[in-house]
A protein has these predicted regions:
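Short acidic amphipathic segments
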Residues: 288, 292-301
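Zn2+-dependent cytidine deaminase-like catalytic core
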Residues: 32-142, 233, 291-293
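Short internal beta-strands
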Residues: 105-113, 209-210, 234-240, 258-260, ...
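Active-site ligand-binding patch in enzyme domains
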Residues: 151-281, 286-290
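Short, basic/aromatic recognition patches
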Residues: 2-23, 152
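Short beta-strand scaffold segments in enzyme catalytic cores
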Residues: 28-38, 163-165, 341
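Conserved histidine-centered catalytic loops in small-molecule metabolism enzymes
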Residues: 265-266, 316-347
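Short gly/pro/ser/thr-enriched loop/turn and capping motifs at secondary-structure boundaries
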Residues: 114-117, 140-141, 216, 241-244, ...
Length: 347
C-alpha cells in the first residue's frame, strides 16, 4: 500500500500541471509502472493537459511507448491514476477501453469519478475484463485536488470562494458615490504580493463575480493580468440596467455574463451549473458578499486584514464601507504584515 500511495501522490503532482487549462474537466495524472524481481520501473507518466484533449491515461501510455519502442509487457504493469478512468465517449474515447485493449494487468485508482456518465462504470468494465483494480488510495487528497469539479458533480452548483480585504478596524473601502472623480478612487488595502496571489486565484477558478456597485465605482477588468492561465468568465448583476456599455467588464478580453431579470442566488447557481461552470471567485462589495454569507451557500472564505485602520476625516469619524459581518474561526497566516484568513467549509 505504501508504494501505491507513493505513485498516486506522483499522479497528483502531475495532475496539477493541467490546473489552469482543463476546467471544467478534473485534473488527472497517471503513472505506468513495471514490476520485476529487480524492483519497480516507471515506464511513463501523463496528465490531462488541455480541455478536450487526450486524458491522462492515453498520454501516459503514449509516453511509455515512445520511451520504450522495444515493446512493453503490459500484463506485468500497474497503471496508477488519480481519478477513475472514463467509460464513455465524450470529446475523447473511453480510457477504460484503452486500458483493457493494452492488457494492463493491474490498475490503482485514487478515487471514483462521481460524473453520472462514469460513477464506477470504468472500474466495473476493467474488472469484468479480468484486470485487478484497487480503488481509494489517497482518496482525501484526490478529492481536495478536484474540489471544484466534485462540487459541480455532487452538489450541482459551482464551488464558491468569497474573498475580500479589510482594514484593521473592519472597513473594505472609503465611502464613494460616483466613478471618474477623485473621490471615487478606491482605498488600497492589499500589498503588491497579495494582489498577485489574487490573480492566481482568478486563474484557478472558472468565473469571477462582482456586484453592480463594484462595476459602477471601480470599472474593473477582472482578468489574470499578473498570473499565467486563462482569464475567468466575468459575472455581474444589473437588475436596474444601470451599467454603462463602455464598462471594462464588457471588453472582449473574456466572456461576461450579466444577470438582469433574475438575480436570485439559487437561480444564478443553477444557471451557472447548467453552463458547466464549476467554480466562482466572488470579489464583490459588502452587499453582495453579505447576501451570499447569509444564504449559507458557499465553500471558502478568504479574508485579508491590513495592519492599518481606515483613514479618518478631520473630526475623526470613520467614513467608510464596513466589511461583511463574518468572524473567522481559523488562525491567520501573516503575509507582508497582513493577516490572511482562509476558512474552508467544504470538507
Amino acid at each position: 500500500m505504501e508504494s501505491a500511495k507513493l505513485y498516486i501522490n506522483r499522479c497528483l503532482q502531475l495532475a496539477r500541471l493541467g490546473e489552469y487549462y482543463v476546467a471544467p474537466n478534473p485534473m488527472v495524472g497517471a503513472v505506468l509502472v513495471q514490476h520485476s524481481a529487480a524492483g519497480d520501473t516507471i515506464l511513463g507518466e501523463g496528465w490531462h493537459e488541455q480541455y478536450g484533449a487526450p486524458h491522462a491515461e492515453p498520454n501516459c501510455i503514449r509516453h511509455a511507448e515512445e520511451a520504450h519502442p522495444e515493446g512493453i509487457d503490459y500484463k506485468h504493469c500497474t497503471l496508477y491514476v488519480s481519478l477513475e478512468p472514463c467509460s464513455h465517449y465524450g470529446k475523447t474515447p473511453p480510457c477504460a477501453e484503452l486500458i483493457i485493449r493494452k492488457g494492463i494487468g493491474r490498475v490503482v485508482v485514487g478515487m471514483l469519478d462521481p460524473n453520472p456518465q462514469v460513477a464506477g462504470r470504468g472500474v466495473k468494465m476493467m474488472r469484468e475484463a479480468g484486470i485487478e483494480v484497487l480503488v481509494g488510495v489517497l482518496e482525501n487528497e484526490c478529492r481536495e485536488l478536484n474540489k471544484r469539479f466534485l462540487c459541480l458533480q455532487e452538489k450541482h452548483r459551482p464551488y464558491i470562494i468569497l474573498k475580500w480585504a479589510q482594514t484593521q478596524d473592519g472597513y473594505i473601502d472609503i465611502t464613494r458615490e460616483t466613478r471618474g472623480d477623485k473621490a471615487s478612487t478606491p482605498l488600497v488595502i492589499s500589498t503588491p504580493l497579495i494582489k498577485q496571489l489574487v490573480h492566481q486565484q482568478r486563474a484557478e477558478n472558472m468565473a469571477i463575480m462582482v456586484g453592480t456597485r463594484t462595476v459602477l465605482l471601480d470599472n474593473p477588468r477582472l482578468l489574470t493580468t499578473h498570473w499565467s492561465g486563462r482569464n475567468p468568465i466575468r459575472i455581474t448583476l444589473d437588475r436596474h440596467r444601470v451599467l454603462p456599455a463602455e464598462s471594462k467588464i464588457f471588453s472582449n478580453e473574456a466572456p461576461t455574463i450579466v444577470y438582469r431579470e433574475n438575480t436570485n442566488w439559487s437561480f444564478i447557481l443553477q444557471d451557472l451549473a447548467n453552463r458547466n461552470i464549476h467554480s466562482i471567485l466572488v470579489e464583490g462589495g459588502t452587499t453582495l458578499l453579505q447576501h451570499i454569507l447569509d444564504s449559507g451557500i458557499y465553500d471558502e472564505v478568504h479574508i485579508e486584514v491590513s495592519n492599518i485602520p481606515l483613514p479618518r476625516t478631520a473630526n475623526q469619524e470613520p467614513n467608510g464601507v464596513k466589511a461583511p459581518d463574518y468572524t473567522p474561526t481559523t488562525q491567520p497566516k501573516v503575509v507582508n504584515n497582513h493577516q490572511i484568513y482562509i476558512e474552508n467549509l467544504h470538507k
